[in-house]
Design a protein with these regions (language model features):
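Internal, well-folded beta-alpha domain core
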Residues: 93-250, 255-259
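Active-site helix-to-loop segments that bind/position phosphate- or nucleotide-bearing substrates
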Residues: 4-95
Length: 259
């Protein structure tokens, strides 16, 4: 069973001492290629491409200008401890022990516009590149053209080990639509379960983005800390008042509600 997750825009490269365990991104050469494309852009071109403020443009222009420098490589940090946002707050990886981190390394994947797909302990450098950015490259007009085949092939390879413990590989989709769209699901040949989190309001259930992001992190944490490989055990998730709503769930779109 593999969990897929979205990255965050905010990165924290302050040193941490959670673990000495680390790994190299499987698509590190592809990341270098994309970084070289971004290195060649002027600040104005970079800001327009990413639709970001002048302050963020300045920061990210400097990041890609320094991409290949020794000090940049030395400043690399494990992905799971670097990304910061609502989903990663729910995940709270800083409290994981080494056993939990090793389980995460086997079952948890972060999709990335720059790195394609990351294991939690993969070392990453300072960057910003969202999957929806229309960066022209050798394979097409945008990052979906560049990554879809590569990410799908890699996930398919990693999911094959599921066959030993279940009749069909299982993908738990806890990523946003922007990142989930980087996968060719028809070629994956896997059962895809998508947990959806809703709040009760005015007589019905609605998705509140900030809460849904946090809940995706909490669900991932629940899977990792309990070493879950049987998807039916996800229905036991009850963090912060959520519960599995069988009545409103449809197929493999599993609804968790609260309120």
């Amino acid at each position: 069973m593999i969990i897929i997750f979205s990255p965050a825009k905010t990165l924290d490269f302050a040193p941490t001492h959670q673990t000495l365990l680390s790994s190299k991104p499987v698509f590190h050469k592809e990341a270098d290629y994309l970084a070289a494309l971004l290195f060649a852009l002027t600040p104005d071109e970079l800001g327009e491409l990413m639709s970001i403020s002048s302050k963020l443009t300045e920061l990210n222009f400097e990041r890609f200008q320094k991409w290949g420098m020794k000090e940049t490589r030395k400043a690399s940090k494990q992905a799971i401890f670097t990304y910061h946002g609502e989903a990663f707050e729910g995940l709270n990886a800083a409290t994981f022990n080494d056993v939990e981190l090793i389980f995460a390394q086997q079952h948890f994947r972060i999709l990335s516009g720059l790195y394609g797909i990351l294991g939690p302990l993969d070392l990453i450098r300072p960057h910003r590149l969202e999957m929806a950015v229309r960066l022209k490259n050798e394979l097409g007009k945008d990052l979906y053209a560049f990554w879809k085949g590569k990410i799908t092939k890699q996930l398919k390879k990693e999911l094959k080990r599921d066959i030993a413990i279940s009749e069909q590989p299982i993908l738990i989709n806890l990523a946003s639509n922007e990142y989930f769209s980087s996968i060719d699901t028809k070629k994956l040949n896997a059962r895809i379960i998508t947990p959806v989190f809703k709040e009760y309001k005015d007589g019905g259930y609605i998705i509140v983005s900030i809460y849904a992001k946090r809940a995706r992190g909490m669900m991932s944490r629940f899977i990792i800390q309990n070493g879950i490989t049987d998807p039916d055990q996800l229905k036991l998730f009850d963090s912060e008042g959520y519960y599995y709503n069988d009545r409103l769930s449809e197929g493999d779109n599993w609804l968790f509600t609260r309120g």
